[in-house]
Amino acid sequence: MSQGVEFNRLMLEMRSMQMEAMAKAKPVQAPAEAGAPSFSEMLSQAVGKVNETQQASTAMANAFEVGQSGVDLTDVMIASQKASVSFQAMTQVRNKLVQAYQDIMQMPV
């Protein structure tokens, strides 16, 4: 008999806690800051930076090929590797975004 009373008391406590939790005012979400960029803007900026890195690497390689003074082979190789790494990182981000989109689209409604 005491187990039944204990169970009922626990159920009443759980219900009261549930009611308290539901009665509490939910915090209002702050609106997005006016100056904060959106996700698409941030993504376009990242792609733009990768493009700039690729173009700078190509320009440096062309300058080295024509024998322009002040352009060292090590600088060309470093710029080339920076461009390669940034492009690979962008590709991985794209792959993860596509995978996330596919996962969301395959979720049952």
From Swiss-Prot:
Any one GO molecular-function label of the UniProt entry: structural molecule activity
Location relative to the cell: Bacterial flagellum basal body
GO cellular component, one term: bacterial-type flagellum basal body
Keyword Disulfide bond annotated: no
Primary location group: other
GO biological process, one term: bacterial-type flagellum-dependent cell motility
UniProt xrefs under InterPro entries: FliE (IPR001624)
Top-level taxon: Bacteria
Keyword line: Bacterial flagellum
Record's keyword annotation contains Transferase: no
HAMAP family from the UniProt entry: FliE
PANTHER family registered for this protein in UniProt: FLAGELLAR HOOK-BASAL BODY COMPLEX PROTEIN FLIE, PTHR34653
Similarity field: Belongs to the FliE family.
Protein name, as recorded: Flagellar hook-basal body complex protein FliE
Origin species: Pseudomonas paraeruginosa (strain DSM 24068 / PA7) (Pseudomonas aeruginosa (strain PA7))
